[in-house]
From Swiss-Prot:
Keywords: Chemotaxis, Cytoplasm, Hydrolase, Phosphoprotein. It holds the Pfam family Response_reg. Interacts with the C-terminal pentapeptide GWEEF of McpB. InterPro entries: CheB-like, CheB_C, CheY-like_superfamily, Sig_transdc_resp-reg_Me-estase, Sig_transdc_resp-reg_receiver. This protein is able to restore chemotaxis to a completely non-chemotactic CheB1 mutant to near wild-type levels. One of its GO terms (cellular component) is cytoplasm. This is Protein-glutamate methylesterase/protein-glutamine glutaminase 2. Belongs to the CheB family. Phosphorylated by CheA. Phosphorylation of the N-terminal regulatory domain activates the methylesterase activity. SMART domains: REC. Its EC number is 3.1.1.61, 3.5.1.44. It comes from Pseudomonas aeruginosa (strain ATCC 15692 / DSM 22644 / CIP 104116 / JCM 14847 / LMG 12228 / 1C / PRS 101 / PAO1). Residues 4-121 form the Response regulatory domain. Gene3D superfamilies: 3.40.50.2300, Methylesterase CheB, C-terminal domain (3.40.50.180).
Amino acid sequence: MPISVLVVDDSALIRSLLKEIIQADPELRLVGCAPDAFVARDLIKQHAPDVISLDVEMPRMDGLTFLDKLMKARPTPVLMISSLTERGSEATLRALELGAVDFIAKPRLGIAEGMQAYAEEIRAKLKTVARARLRRRAADAPAPPESAAPLLSTEKIIALGASTGGTEALKEVLLGLPAHSPGVVITQHMPPGFTRSFAERLDRLTRLSVSEARDGDRILPGHALVAPGDHHMEVQRSGANYVVRLNRQAQVNGHRPAVDVMFESLARCAGRNLLAGLLTGMGKDGARGLLAIRQAGGYTLAQDEATCVVYGMPREAVELGAAEDVLPLERIAAALLQQAARRGSGNRL
């Protein structure tokens, strides 16, 4: 049976383009197009769509307010349609917090041509989002108790990779890490501009100092670096330190940044000093790199199916034998810290 889709967007052009894109796929069935939240509400009651594409910025009732009401009254998988602006990226991150599963960024210029170029991605994301497991909105995790022996060390590195559903999963893991945590490197599939807003949001919410990575940044205790959109992030050893290197080489597994690029570079230079987790996401990116880390002596884990929004990347890792542990999201931070303590303190600062 085809997946039923409702399009909610105030732009007649976007509605028309999405209609054309959706109707070109026999696995998708368009049940309606709404110019605002009020028309959408009536269509949802009438058709109970499997997935909704929702514009962030709309008149009468903005997309975030509507999303908040929808998730409380009738939780439904939602794909956000966002503008590639700083305001748009902030709103999109808030939408993911409120329960949206994923997003597509509208091109800045040439919307008709740009949307058609993304047609396959839009159709694929609608199908993935429709099948996604909706997570109940949870309160922020309590701060972990401070350890008597701080984990300040330039040796240990926590590496995290994620895709669909990853912004909230990564937030939960980082909320579970103390200010004296080993340095953290993160690759989350996300376009340019969004990664900076994502890093700034994590910096405000967690006890770590979080920033978008710049080429040559050192990996330091209590700091987390997020791979910038459209750049691969590798890690290299530099004397007693680890530094990140950015490049714009070809996409890997259809992504730039790719988790495999980060994980495989870490396997080469850090080995036993690594604590790596592969979180929720579609596809297989990161599984091969996680296996390389395990083979190099690092600790590896994958998020379990029950707590993943999309159990794709972690499933691939488990099937490859790459994950030493398979854990629910709420236990991942504690497991990483426990393994860091077991593996010794390294070079204390």
